[in-house]
Amino acid sequence: MLAHKASDEGVAVAERIAGQKPHIDFNNVPFVIYTDPEIAWVGKTEEQLKAEGVEYKKGTSGFGANGRALAMGKAKGTVKVLADAKTDRILGVHMIGPVVSELVTEGVTALEFFASSEDIARITVSYTHLRAHETVLDL
């Protein structure tokens, strides 16, 4: 899977042996399928949230209007963000498209630091950056 995940698991084992609470949250570990287009996700799926009885809202957007994706000739793809309906906290990020193996890090950061969709929407990045900004605006 991921070398970084294996490293974190090793640290978690050492923490547990030392009587500490392991720091790793497996919900925040990204999954990536290196195909063309790439597929990546982190956090909960809609099915998991429904099974847990969590009320959520969903935002989706595509790469069709993204200048960088258009310049790359890879404007096909979509991003879906799931957020708690009451708190707006991001619960899951799912995507397919160009370089989403890198873009998923934005979702990992949001989950790790309990960000809301509004928190992510307020971040300003360079214009031609592939990101989930438009998706959280849809929430």
Residue ranges and their predicted role:
Residues 1, 5, 9, 102-105:
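An amphipathic alpha-helix/helix-turn recognition signal
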Residues 132-139:
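Single conserved hydrophobic/aromatic residue that forms the stacking wall/gate
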Residues 5-25:
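Internal hydrophobic alpha-helix adjacent to the cofactor/substrate pocket in enzyme cavities
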Residues 18, 29, 34-45, 50-131:
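Flexible, glycine-rich terminal cap/loop adjacent to redox cofactors
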